[in-house]
Amino acid sequence: MNRKAVVLGGTGLIGGELIKLLVKNNSYSEIRILGRRNVDIASSKIRFYKVDMENLQQHESLFEVDVVFCCLGTTIKTAGTKEGFRKVDYEMVMNAAKNAEKYVKKFILISSLGANANASNFYLKTKGEVEKMVLETKIESISILRPSILYGNRVEKRSGEKVGIAFMKFATPILQGSLKKYRGIEARTVAEAMVIYDLEEKKGKFIYESLEIENLVKNN
C-alpha cells in the first residue's frame, strides 16, 4: 500500500505513539502532521505543516489523503476554561471532520470512555457531542475509540491524572466482569488499534470501547 495520512494531535501521548508506528509501517508513504509544532521524530515520511489550528478550514487541501487520525484533546485545567477546552475538543475536531469529509474515506477519532452527549459532566458531554457531529458527516468509514485512563510517558504533566493512574494500577486486579472496561490502557495499544482499524477493509461507522481496543491488539 501507499497510504497518505494526516495526523492531528501528534505531539500528544497517543499521537506520538501513532506517528512512531506509522513511520515503521510500510503501508504508509507520507505522514502529514498538522499543528503548531513539529514532533521530535525523524523520518523522510513526515511532512510537517505549521497551521492555525483554530482555522483549519483554511488548510483543507492538506486533507487530500487516505485517512485522518484525529488525536486532538486537552483538559479544562490545561485549557484554562471550559470554553478553551471546547475550542480544542469540539471546534477543532469539527473543522477537521468537515475538511476530511471532502476528501478522505477514513476518519479515526480518539474520544473517551463514558462519552455521552447527554451527560451532566461537561467533559464527557463535549466528547459525546463531538462524536455525534463526526458520525453525522458523509465520511465513508469512521472509527471512534473510547479509551479509559491512559498509561504512557506524557510530555505534559497532569497531576490529577497521575493520581488516577496510580489508583487504577492498584485497582486493576479487582476490576472484573462489567468493570473491566474501566481498566487503564497503554497509549501505544490505542495507537496500534488505530492503525489496525485503518488497514481493515471495513466500511461503516463504529465506536470501540476501551476493552475492545485492548482485545483487538492482543489478538493481532
Where are these regions (language model features)?
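NAD(P)H-binding glycine-rich loop region in Rossmannoid oxidoreductase-like domains
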Residues: 5, 46-95, 99-102, 116, ...
